Amino acid sequence: MVDFSKELRALVQSPHSQWLDTLAPQLTAFKNNPHGNLKRWQRVLTQLPNLTAKHVKLSNTVQVGEADEASDADRARLTGLLQQLQPWRKGPFDLFGVFIDTEWRSDWKWQRVAPHLDDLSGRQVLDVGCGSGYHLWRMLEAGAEQVWGIDPGELFLMQFRAISQLMPLSWQQRAHFFPVGIEHMPELKSFDTVFSMGVLYHRRSPVEFLQQLKSLIRPGGQLVLETIVVEGDETTVMMPGERYAQMRNVWFLPSASALSVWLERLGFKDISVVDHNTTSIDEQRRTDWMTGESLADFLDPNDTNKTIEGYQAPIRAVITARV
């Protein structure tokens, strides 16, 4: 059974303690309906070598320990165990000399986002759809006091816990992950900064989702939104067919201008499109740690400006706004 007692104690002592009312039943439901592989993944965590990291560097590659801080045997054991948690999608990580070359170069996204953030020093930060938690560690690097990630993916939880387990306690105590979605979160209005990166296009009701994000941010706090967009003006919104870039669960792709209008209608202020970037096959690709299909397989082989279905290839925008 997955234990969340440490995370819940931290939550009770935080400005977000009201969240406990809805979160506790969700975690009970999670425990009562585990993923079929959850026990196997948990066994991996119990078998990780007991290593002490003297050096932690939360930079482009999130590094925990150095190669000379682990024996060859421990490093080989660590490699084999972490490979059992594939696919690794968001990173990269370097754990005692074991380099996890993830599908996404998530550090590239952070480099696009970071210059446009309010100062995170001392802030309470939430990442909605945090994946394996790579960006949570980068938020701590930027000075956040506490970072909270939510994502319903059980494998992401196990990957996050594997990284956290190898971290010194001082870092572990500031990063928290709950395997839940945003749907049942109360209107906390308590987070200084809320991130949502790579989630909006998966939502059937994107405007409702934006309103939910707004309800979590304190007055004056910042929203950082990253999502796939299409070219066009403030009236342009595309709903693809059954698949977009081979993804079944893509619903609405607005232009950056249309998305800005949505945010304005919801009462956000200081709305700014700070980045507009075409996703490249160097940023999202197959690796030894994610051996399945990746972006190159989802694009038209004769025209990489289009998806395999004939739509515009993924362009991602970053928009910041305040409450």
Swiss-Prot record:
Positions that bind carboxy-S-adenosyl-L-methionine: 90, 104, 109, 129, 182-183, 197, 201, 316
Lineage top rank: taxon: Bacteria
GO MF: transferase activity, transferring alkyl or aryl (other than methyl) groups
InterPro entries linked to this entry: CmoB, Mo5U34_MeTrfas-like, SAM-dependent_MTases_sf
Keyword set, alphabetical order: Transferase, tRNA processing
EC assignment: 2.5.1.-
GO BP term, example: tRNA wobble uridine modification
Keyword presence, Cell cycle: no
Catalyzed chemical reaction(s): carboxy-S-adenosyl-L-methionine + 5-hydroxyuridine(34) in tRNA = 5-carboxymethoxyuridine(34) in tRNA + S-adenosyl-L-homocysteine + H(+)
Family from the record: Belongs to the class I-like SAM-binding methyltransferase superfamily. CmoB family.
Function: Catalyzes carboxymethyl transfer from carboxy-S-adenosyl-L-methionine (Cx-SAM) to 5-hydroxyuridine (ho5U) to form 5-carboxymethoxyuridine (cmo5U) at position 34 in tRNAs.
NCBIfam families xrefs: PRK15068.1 (NF011650), tRNA 5-methoxyuridine(34)/uridine 5-oxyacetic acid(34) synthase CmoB (TIGR00452)
Quaternary state and interactors: Homotetramer.
The protein's name: tRNA U34 carboxymethyltransferase
Gene name of the record: cmoB
